[in-house]
A protein has these predicted regions:
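DNA-recognition alpha helix
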Residues: 1-11
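A polyampholytic, Gly/Pro-enriched intrinsically disordered region
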Residues: 153-170
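Glycine- and acidic
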Residues: 9, 82-87, 289-293, 312
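Acidic/histidine-rich catalytic cores and adjacent linkers
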Residues: 110, 117-129, 142, 166-344
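Conserved His + Asp/Glu catalytic blocks
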Residues: 145
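RNase H-like nuclease fold core
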Residues: 11-115, 125-140, 148-152, 169, ...
Length: 344
């Protein structure tokens, strides 16, 4: 491919794939080494976002990002973060995570204002061991609330199974355009709203379907109470998540969102849905207890999920390779500010 491009544009000698790969890794390593110095020299108020990857080969990748302690006024973007930790082990115990975080803190010279992560026991315990304030990621936490409410619910699981069977039965037919989206096996409660949205739209348009289509999806109206219940949870979840992701959590916003939940999402006739809403209400209260007046903290770790997504897309499809030095492309792929000048 590179030879074809070179011939088309009159380039006498085109760099090889290996050369490009070496450049990317060299630039990534240089930026990785400088990230901690830049934070230290600029006296940046920073916080950590920490997460570990799924098993790659026989290894797990621990990724540590430094983000602005104060929400920048929008959902975190790649240019807002610095990769300050890339570590690989077979597994990550809390003590190991704490040791790596402490190494980063020692090099920077002062502590982060807080640590943001999912509810993984090892990550939470590592933060506690270092006596650092810990924020629970809003998306993962909401997913846990839904899992607690619905994971063992008979009708919920029946409806999921009927959707799965419909996909298998009609995916190569003229009804395929009406099928629900795929259900994810992992983090399924964090991603169930795609099919909830599908179910709501099918309910609203059910009477407009022809007889064959109605027969294929006759099970959907039978679960309309469950669907509308999940739709209400989705409405609250979406509103709270978008507010917190884009504005950050402040004491003012916490009060605004808790008032919103009480006014709009407390259902005396539905104890399960009310229970979910009260868990969200209490979650906001707990996270706001870590704030001082005037502070606005980031509560969404979607940015680290995005970076892991890039890594999974670019890494070798051969699972036996594990994590290779090409992981350094993560730092060079970020849109770094001009103040970060790599020294080769």
């Amino acid at each position: 491919m590179l030879s074809v491009i070179g011939e088309e544009y009159g380039v006498a000698k085109v760099v090889s794939h290996q050369t490009v790969s070496d450049w990317v890794k060299t630039a990534g390593l240089a930026m990785y080494k400088e990230a901690r110095r830049v934070i230290r020299d600029s006296k940046m108020r920073y916080s950590f976002v920490v997460d570990e990857s799924i098993t790659i080969g026989s290894q797990k990748l621990l990724l540590v990002l430094a983000i602005p302690a104060e929400c920048p006024g929008h959902a975190l973007r790649h240019e807002d973060v610095k990769v300050v930790g890339i570590f690989v082990e077979k597994s990550w115990k809390a003590e190991d995570v704490a040791r790596k975080l402490q190494e980063i803190v020692d090099e920077i010279g002062y502590k982060p204002e807080y640590v943001l992560s999912d509810n993984g026991h090892n990550l939470v315990k590592a933060t506690s061991n270092l006596e650092l304030p810990h924020h629970k990621d809003i998306g993962h936490t909401f997913g846990l609330f839904l899992e607690e409410a619905y994971d063992d619910d008979k009708r919920f699981n029946e409806f999921k199974e009927l959707m799965r069977k419909a996909r298998l039965q009609y995916h190569l037919t003229d009804k395929a355009f009406l099928l629900p989206p795929n259900q994810r096996a992992m983090a399924r409660f964090m991603n169930l709203f795609n099919w909830v949205d599908w179910a709501v739209r099918l309910l609203l348009s059910y009477e407009q379907l022809n007889e064959e289509q109605k027969l294929a999806f006759v099970f959907v109206p039978a679960y309309k109470d469950l669907i509308w219940e999940l739709a209400e949870a989705m409405k609250c979840y979406t509103h709270v998540l978008e507010k917190v992701k884009n504005e950050g959590l402040s004491i003012r916003l916490c009060k605004e969102l808790r008032d919103y939940i009480v006014r709009n999402h407390i259902y005396p006739g539905n104890l399960r849905l009310t229970g979910i809403m009260m868990k969200v209400w209490n979650y906001l209260k707990e996270e706001a207890s870590l704030l001082k007046p005037g502070q606005t903290h980031n509560l969404s770790s979607d940015i680290i999920e995005s970076i892991f997504g890039i890594f999974k897309q670019k890494k070798s499809p051969n699972h036996l390779y594990g994590v290779t030095p090409f992981v350094l492309f993560l730092t060079s792929s970020m849109r770094h500010p001009a103040s970060l000048h790599p020294q080769f």
